[in-house]
Design a protein with these regions (language model features):
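Core catalytic alpha/beta fold that binds nucleotide/phospho-ligands
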Residues: 1-130
């Protein structure tokens, strides 16, 4: 396999908390795919956990879009970049719609995702291989 794309993103958790407070449901619906909503709802009881959840997802999606070489927009919508976890807890990236088509154009066969967060920031790193 060879690497076709690498992307990383660093997000300030407080910025996502402010967006969530300002736009509420509209923001989460624009950011999260239906498969991600349950994870968000599980953390929604605590503002800090909810903001960290959203920041991790946003960082992962931005990193994935950068690895695809297109950024967030017509070729990769936020809800088309889906972050879930394996039963062991490892993060997984799935692409649908236009994001999947962009990945297919690049010949992507495998996506590797790493996500981390600390008190104030969330970080994600994506490697795409063909």
């Amino acid at each position: 396999m060879s690497i076709v794309g690498i992307g990383t993103d660093l997000v300030e958790i407080g910025r996502l908390a402010a967006l969530q407070q300002r736009y509420a449901v509209r923001f989460t619906e624009r950011l999260l795919a239906p498969a991600e909503q349950a994870g968000y709802q599980a953390s929604a009881h605590c503002d800090r956990k909810a903001a960290a959840f959203l920041a991790r997802r946003f960082a992962a999606k931005e990193a994935a879009a950068k690895a695809l070489g297109c950024g967030i927009g017509a070729q990769a919508r936020l809800t088309e970049l889906v972050v879930t976890h394996t039963t062991a807890g490892a993060p997984c990236l799935t692409m649908t719609g236009a994001a999947r088509r962009q990945a297919n154009r690049l010949g992507v066969r495998c996506a590797h995702l790493s996500i981390s967060d600390e008190r104030d920031h969330a970080l994600a790193f994506v490697i795409l291989e063909r």
